Amino acid sequence: MHVDPASPLTLKMRTAAFGPRERLPARHGDESFDLSPKHQRQSFESPMQRPWGPNYKQSVAPSPRVLWFTTRRFLLSLDGLALAVFALLAWRYLLFPSRDIDVSGMQAKASTDSYFLDLWVKHVTDHPIRARDRTGFSEMGLRTSMYAHLLADPSLPDFEEYERKLWPFIPGIASLRKSYFEGARYASEKRPKTRGIVMSLGKNDFDFAIQYISIIRDHYRSNIPIELYYYGEDDLPPHMRHYLTTEFPNVSTVDLEALGFFDENLTQLKRQGFALKPFALVATNFTEVMLADADAVLLASPEEFFEQKGFKETGTLFFHDRDHVRAGAAAIIHEFMNSNLEARGPSERLAKSAFWQRKGIYEQESGIVVVDKSRMEVFAALLFSAWQNTGEVRRRTTYRIFWGDKETFWLAFELAGFQYFFVKHYAGAIGREHAAHAEGFCSEHPFHVFDAPGTIISDGSHAASNLTQAKAEAEAAASALLMADVENQDPKSTAVQLARKEARKVKPAWFNGSLLELKKISRELYISPTAWAIDGQWEFLEDSELWCLRNYTAMPMSEHGLDRNIQQLISTGTRGLARSNAAMSRGEFAPRGEEFDIPA
């Protein structure tokens, strides 16, 4: 059989089997994670034990000989051995073809690709990924990467079988993919891409959704389509759905359960709240999508999010969560990351992050996620993210290592080797500085910004500015993590002045926690912030159950006109909520014979 070694699929298989980067030596031989307290106390003292950090060195373009010796120990693992057998079979037919086929041109290429796809499907079928396999997420990333490559030519024999084996929780994946990409390709040629907002919504967040949509429609004067996803009749009652779709133009509701896209036995989404979010992203027909939590408050129009340079370059716009360290949890997270990235190493973006350098256990805040589904890599990564939120996987791995759905978005891109973009700054704070506590800037509202102009380079990573570096060096010299009180910072010092100059360049984007001061306690007391802040480190105070920011850069509310904007948002949100309460009290939207409580 004649096989073209330059075939794209052949090259992709070779890269997938051995990886483009030098591999870290495997330290553990167990096949599953030990989440016991004993494991949580594990520490990594020597550089050889350290799973990641500044001492990690990555070879950008290792030679084949270096690749062989650095991957040898990885190939001893079960998943590595399976890939090795697959690679050897592939090379056997490359180097020693059994017979020639009298075909030429595209026919020869199609024959080669079909043969390798058959081998790959057999590998996926014979080696299903278990929820707690030590390197299961890494293997799933490899399979997702291959899937994205094959999306360019889905007419290959066995492709749909591979698709079904890879995404068994979506029985109609072939129909979903065909309908979506036919529309997306047509849209790219004949009409503008379709933009929309997607939100997973339950009855407990009805008030927040009212305020969110009121702000979009009345404050920003945006008519961007909005889809509200729920799961089952009890999740979002009919009278609430009726009000949302009649009061606001261009708003629709979608029952994911009735939609029938997903296998409930595998996804187990009933009464799961945030786990619905990646499935809503998969289900929507929008091309460019903003996924939003109901309690997110936009400080810029939704259209501005889609215009960010990082989004245009990569098809993704991600925001960081709080920069917070917790030793017990860090051991589990670092073990997971090392196990699943030891074969390839981190991407350039991840290698530079505070998360990788063990300065925090949170990386992404999923209150706002912006993606371009017309890109095949983005589409494939969203399927991988949804897989991480299926019932057994989230219960046995994802939600035991991380905190809900948050990390499943960027992690899908990272493990599949796809490009993605994060705003540079980790979450800051907005609120009343020193209102009741001297521990720092305590706030229930993480604050997010757009990058300052000029901080994005061509590959989507961030160019570290001299001002940020100067602030970091000054803070490091002044105090260790969380050891210096913010009151001791001299506002006239060079470091503080440089930090404030840098902060003026960013633009407020959004914050978490709704317009309420404490949403879990009162539905009537609205925020009245006196300052906003970026940078610094977060600390959780166990006794008072408060999140407080230390060593931050504080800015007045007058900066960027944020004080005026917040007051206008509160006014718009309260008017929208008042209309809703009035309609509900009159019973205008109650189904016949139904009684319900008026939302507080």
Briefly describe each language-model feature range:
Residues 1-74:
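Short, low-complexity, Lys/Arg-enriched N-terminal segments of secretory-pathway carbohydrate enzymes
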